């Protein structure tokens, strides 16, 4: 299935996909969050008949439209890369992966594409009720798009509802609902959408604070701040619940990722959660005797509780996961990395032997090889791993990204609470420090979201599909120079699109809500 491939090709293919995904995620969360906020504002207008709320909704709707258009462009490129750069992946799991993507394209995207036209051009042309319904259906469509994409991503983290067909050398879906309703998929959807809501709330809050700093459109700004702060606080509180669920699912399904998130090399019972820490750069191998941290502050036993819902539960570290021998939460003894690698090689060899036996029409031998393949298939991907150290993701990047996400999440809760208190006291319009904090918090939501995706994707390495297909076995056999060329072309293109969006948005913001109403 995989030949000798230049490692530079793997690195450049990963870099290109990461570039596209991270640029795409600059636009998606604002679509998810701002879309709901504008729909809430239009709902207030529908219920009250207050024209000020209509102008407010129209202004944020204009910024939503600018962002939506750029997000669609980057998303299309991202989907095409599966076929161009990751053809082995596309072949091996295309039967499963393409199903949610197809539903996203046929149902969700066309739904939002249909109603967005009414939302933008239907003011005073259709009834208030129909226009409001179109606005809500547009954001529901966008959210459903996110749902199916996240189901596909969750399946890569936790592959279920499929079986391997040795005759086609492909994984084939046999239970659609197991894929769509897996606990990882459900939790990932809510966690990701809530993060988008927070980005939208911070965006509205920050732009509104800019108007207050400029002493412009004060009533518009104050009403927008109130809606965004309430919305953002609700999302920030709910995301704690989904974050806890994410940590639990990672502990159950991807223990190596959890160990990297915590810089945990030696596991144990009653393990503490690192609140703040500085990793020891001298620790370059899981085999050395260097301490993992130069400095750290831990919450006693909290990691054990997050991972197993038991303050004294055992949580394996990186060394334990590599060496095996510990008792898992299912009561079984964990295999070592070397044992898994041997089982993976056995599965790969059994597949080759099975296909040869089928070709030779040796039914008896084919049956034996198939049994061997099925017994060892859960470790199929390990057969492509050459060194157990390859199973360890980048600890530093995963560890620090996780803390950036969590610390910023706590900051957002504090910001929204303070904003609502100041709003209740009628102080926001005259509190310039809070206005500056609100304005400069806009990029922090994006940083938190990007950090979360780094934890999810870097922490999963070396796997494209957990335990089944490593990233190194997923790529297309291309000339590395061609991938480098398209990497830089995409970098230039995406940067131009980003600059264009920011420029158009800044121009619209400077014109103000009065211009958006015409």
Residue ranges, per PLM feature:
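Internal alpha-helical transmembrane segments
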Residues: 117-125, 130-136, 147-156, 173-176, ...
């Amino acid at each position: 299935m995989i030949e000798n491939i230049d490692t530079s090709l793997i690195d450049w293919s990963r870099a290109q996909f990461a570039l596209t995904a991270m640029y795409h995620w600059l636009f998606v969360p604002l679509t998810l969050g701002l879309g709901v906020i504008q729909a809430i504002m239009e709902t207030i207008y529908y219920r009250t008949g207050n024209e000020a709320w209509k102008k407010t909704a129209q202004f944020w709707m204009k910024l939503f439209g600018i962002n939506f258009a750029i997000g669609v462009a980057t998303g299309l490129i991202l989907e095409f890369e599966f076929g161009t750069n990751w053809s082995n992946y596309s072949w091996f799991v295309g039967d499963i992966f393409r199903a949610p993507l197809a539903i996203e394209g046929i149902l969700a995207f066309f739904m939002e594409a249909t109603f967005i036209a009414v939302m933008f051009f239907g003011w005073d042309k259709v009834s208030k009720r129909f226009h409001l319904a179109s606005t809500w259906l547009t954001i529901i469509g966008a959210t459903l798009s996110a749902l199916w994409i996240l189901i596909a991503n969750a399946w890569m983290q936790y592959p279920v509802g499929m079986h391997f067909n040795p005759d086609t050398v492909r994984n084939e879906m046999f239970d659609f609902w197991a894929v769509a309703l897996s606990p990882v998929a459900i939790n990932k959807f809510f966690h990701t959408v809530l993060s988008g809501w927070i980005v939208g709330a911070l965006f509205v809050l920050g732009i509104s604070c800019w108007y207050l700093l400029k002493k412009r459109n004060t009533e518009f700004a104050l009403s927008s701040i109130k809606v965004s702060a309430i919305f953002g606080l609700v999302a920030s509180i709910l995301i704690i619940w989904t974050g806890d669920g994410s940590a639990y699912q990672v502990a159950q399904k991807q223990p190596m990722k959890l160990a990297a998130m915590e810089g945990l090399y030696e596991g144990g019972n009653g393990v503490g959660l690192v609140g703040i820490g500085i990793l020891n750069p001298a620790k370059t191998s899981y085999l050395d005797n260097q301490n993992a941290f130069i400095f750290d502050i831990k919450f006693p036993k909290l990691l054990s509780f997050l991972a197993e819902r038991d303050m004294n539960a055992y949580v394996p570290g990186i060394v334990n996961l590599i060496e095996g021998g510990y008792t898992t939460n299912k009561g079984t003894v964990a295999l070592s990395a070397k044992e898994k690698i041997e089982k993976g090689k056995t599965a790969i060899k059994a597949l080759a032997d099975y296909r040869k036996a089928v070709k030779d029409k040796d039914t008896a031998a084919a049956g034996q090889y198939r049994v061997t393949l099925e017994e060892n298939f859960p470790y199929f991907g390990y057969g492509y791993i050459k060194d157990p150290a390859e199973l360890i993701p980048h600890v530093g990047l995963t560890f620090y990204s996780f803390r950036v996400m969590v610390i910023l999440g706590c900051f957002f809760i504090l910001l929204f609470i303070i904003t609502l208190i100041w709003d209740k006291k009628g102080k926001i319009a005259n509190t310039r420090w809070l206005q500056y904090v609100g304005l400069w918090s806009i990029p922090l939501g994006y940083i938190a979201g990007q950090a979360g995706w780094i934890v999810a994707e870097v922490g999963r390495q070396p796997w494209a599909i957990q335990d089944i297909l490593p990233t190194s076995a997923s790529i297309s056999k291309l000339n590395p120079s061609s991938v480098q060329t398209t990497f830089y072309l995409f970098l230039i293109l995406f940067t131009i699109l980003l600059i264009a969006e920011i420029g158009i948005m800044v121009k619209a913001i400077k014109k103000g809500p009065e211009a958006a109403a015409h």
